[in-house]
Amino acid sequence: MKVIALFFLFAFIFCTLEVAIVEAGFGCPLNQGACHRHCLSIRRRGGYCSGFFKQTCTCYRN
């Protein structure tokens, strides 16, 4: 029973790290300014880091 619990714990941690690597971008989660500048560069009004642990750069609509 303990082996199964440890397996699921490691699987959960691995999946969480994989999601973080895939979704992190444009400065998020540590540099919200980079996300904002990216959004400005694609002709949006700006942007911010949102989502789970602020890992997704979300741009404001024009």
UniProtKB/Swiss-Prot annotation:
Keyword match Secreted: yes
Gene Ontology terms describing biological process: defense response to bacterium; innate immune response
GO molecular function: potassium channel regulator activity; toxin activity
GO CC list: extracellular region
Cysteine pairings via disulfide bonds: C28-C49, C35-C57, C39-C59
Location within or outside the cell: Secreted
Record keyword Signal present: yes
Signal peptide as annotated in the record: 1-24
Main localization (coarse): secreted
Family: Belongs to the invertebrate defensin family. Type 2 subfamily.
Primary role: Antibacterial peptide active against Gram-positive bacteria (including S.aureus ATCC25923 (MIC=2.5 uM), M.luteus AB93113 (MIC=2.5 uM), and the antibiotic-resistant S.epidermidis PRSE P1389 (MIC=1.25 uM)), but not against Gram-negative bacteria (including E.coli and P.aeruginosa). Also has weak blocking activity on Kv1.1/KCNA1 (8.7% inhibition), Kv1.2/KCNA2 (10.2% inhibition), Kv1.3/KCNA3 (9.0% inhibition), KCa3.1/KCNN4/IK (9.1% inhibition), KCa2.3/KCNN3/SK3 (46.3% inhibition) and Kv11.1/KCNH2/ERG1 (16.9% inhibition) channels (tested at 1 uM).
Protein known as: Defensin BmKDfsin5
